[in-house]
């Protein structure tokens, strides 16, 4: 008898809440405006540059990224 209410509560806790469309649109507008204000342009190979600053582990991750997706490689 106690299993059904407990199951329903666990199901409600585990299910993701649906995002509010208005809130999501406002958030994406704010992010877009902030990027335009800062005039941020991502240079090619930015992930590879960040990973190279991390040392040996960064070089391994950067090399793996280049084999999987060439967009994260820096041009040489």
Swiss-Prot record:
UniProtKB keywords: Disulfide bond, Neurotoxin, Secreted, Signal, Toxin
Post-translational modification: Contains 2 disulfide bonds that can be either 'C1-C3, C2-C4' or 'C1-C4, C2-C3', since these disulfide connectivities have been observed for conotoxins with cysteine framework V (for examples, see AC P0DQQ7 and AC P81755).
Pfam family, one: Conotoxin
Residues that make up the propeptide removed upon maturation: 20-44
InterPro entries: Conotoxin (IPR004214)
Organs and tissues of expression: Expressed by the venom duct.
Localization per record: Secreted
Tagged with keyword Secreted: yes
Main location per the UniProt record: secreted
Molecular function GO labels: ion channel inhibitor activity; toxin activity
Cellular compartments per GO CC: extracellular region
Family: Belongs to the conotoxin T superfamily.
Protein name: Conotoxin TsMLCL-03
